UniProtKB/Swiss-Prot annotation:
Family: Belongs to the NARF family.
Single Gene Ontology BP annotation: response to oxygen levels
GO-annotated molecular function: 4 iron, 4 sulfur cluster binding; metal ion binding
Protein name in UniProt: Protein NAR1
Species name: Arabidopsis thaliana
A Pfam family this chain is assigned to: Fe_hyd_SSU
Tissue expression summary: Expressed in developing tissues, including shoot apex, young leaves, vascular tissues, root tips, pedicels, carpels and developing seeds.
Gene assigned in the entry: NAR1
Length: 474
């Protein structure tokens, strides 16, 4: 069984002889009437029917209470290098968005800086026919701004006179990790989902920016644009395939054409495989100028963004909430207190001897269970929790490049963190990002607006776990 997916999405006792159609429990139809039959024996000669082969897509995996089996290569055929190369060969307008975690992984592997990686990767991808290479740090700033607005709104609502009846209670649980979201929908259901932030992940936010704004601004035909993201996590492939991120073309000629915000997701490891496949010496590639339209890069050529290696959600929202709710400007680094282990930390804001804000970082499913129990028993005293399924967070995603010979996973994570934090990247406030400001002015209007809710928010769906009820429909 492949270890690429997060533990929640794997079924450990399956082998490679099990095909998706055998393991999947999703029904072919929503309902089938129950027909009462007589107990008397009957002989019926029915005409032979030519049955169509059953096809199971990746969306089916997200819609049922099954799991990804060892035949995930079949289900993920549209999330592969072959599909990416096929889109290029068909003359599609291919756009690639690269995550900062993937850049850090490539930087450590090739022993160069993340900025050099980005410029060389731009050279490499454009040599294949890619039209533009963007930076998901840009969309992450959009998401952080919207998340700050969401938290302040939910905090005020929860602390109002009618706070007990709030439909958006505290704590707010972050939503950027697809492994955590899939687990919450399939295993935790309705008692946890109301706490989850409705703000999209940076991957889906940049997909929305490209498909719902940039294409229109540049006069591109939506069905000709093929958007690919490079991510540290295989579960991002599942996220991109959700029905929530499918939309209509909107034109008269292609009114029934279904499009997705992200057409395909490639992991960092798959990008390295592509480099090897093309026989390229990556370190010897020239460094191309970066595409500035959706990239956090200064006029001097430096990258900028938040410092958090898993998105910086807790820190950014904590600083904003301290200022917006209590008038406190926090200078310098936040002092996170380590609790059970380095993957479970908390930070508090004290005013006049009273704790007014209490946030937590929670990485890995072992620590996640602790938070879930507290939420379920209504004993969680945090107002916000940044949750990631992988221990050590996104830098340790299953799609990252594996350790070199003689290097331990722990040593690799330390190298990734040092590279990510000590990069030439400038640590900046998302609210000061000129690209984010422009996108709000031209497209989203302001944080919390109807446009922002339409394009930067999503919803979650508790999945019924009863296999019996599903089998009744077969």
């Amino acid at each position: 069984m492949s270890e690429k997916f997060s533990p929640t999405l794997r079924l450990g006792d399956l082998n490679d002889f099990i095909a998706p159609s055998q393991a999947c429990v999703i029904s072919l139809k929503d309902s089938k009437p129950i027909v009462k039959k007589s107990d008397r024996p009957q002989v019926v000669i029915a005409p032979k029917q030519q049955l169509e082969p059953v096809k199971i897509s990746l969306k089916d995996c997200l819609a049922c209470s099954g799991c990804i089996t060892s035949a995930e290569t079949v289900m993920l055929e549209k999330q592969s290098l072959d599909e990416f190369l096929s889109a290029l060969s068909k003359g599609k307008d291919v756009v690639v968005s690269v995550s900062p975690q993937s850049r850090a992984s490539l930087a450590v592997h090739y022993d160069i800086s993340p900025l050099q990686v980005f410029k060389k990767l731009t050279t490499f991808l454009k040599s294949l026919g890619v039209k533009a290479v963007f930076d998901t740090s840009c969309s992450r700033d959009l998401v952080l701004i919207e998340s700050c607005n969401e938290f302040v709104s939910r905090y005020k609502q929860a602390n109002s006179d009618d706070g007990e009846n709030s439909q958006s209670p505290l704590p707010v649980l972050s939503s950027a990790c697809p492994g955590w979201i899939c687990y919450a929908e399939k295993q935790l259901g309705s008692y946890v989902l109301p706490y989850v932030s409705s703000v999209k992940s940076p991957q889906q936010a940049i997909g929305a920016a490209i498909k719902h704004h940039l294409c229109q601004a540049l006069g591109l035909r939506l069905h000709e644009v093929y958007h690919v993201t490079v991510m540290p996590c295989y579960d991002k492939k599942l996220e991109a395939a959700r029905d929530d991120f499918v939309f209509d073309d909107g034109t008269q000629d292609n009114g029934d054409l279904k499009l997705t915000e992200v057409d395909s997701v490639l992991t960092t490891g798959e990008i390295m495989d592509l480099i090897k496949l093309k026989g390229v010496d990556f370190k010897d590639l020239e460094e191309s100028p970066l595409d500035r339209v959706l990239t956090n890069v200064t006029e001097e050529g430096d990258l900028y963004g938040v410092a958090g290696s898993s998105g910086g959600y807790a820190e950014t929202i904590f600083r904003h909430a301290a200022k917006a709710l209590f008038g406190q400007t926090i200078e310098g680094p936040l002092e996170f207190k380590t609790l059970r282990n380095s993957d479970f930390r908390e930070v508090t804001l004290q005013l006049e001897g009273k704790t007014v804000l209490k946030f937590a970082l929670c990485y890995g499913f072992q620590n996640l269970q602790n938070i879930v129990r507290r939420v379920k028993t209504r004993k969680c005293d945090y107002q916000y929790v940044e949750i990631m399924a992988c221990p050590a967070g996104c830098l340790n995603g299953g799609g990252q490049i594996k350790p070199k010979t003689g290097q331990s996973q722990k040593e690799l994570i330390h190298s990734l963190e040092a590279t990510y934090m000590n990069d030439t990247t400038l640590n900046t406030d998302p609210y000061q990002n000129p690209t984010a400001k422009r996108l709000f002015e031209e497209w989203l209007k302001e944080p919390g607006s109807n446009e922002a809710k339409k394009y930067l928010h999503t919803q979650y769906h508790p999945v019924v776990k009863s296999v019996t009820s599903q089998l009744n429909n077969w």
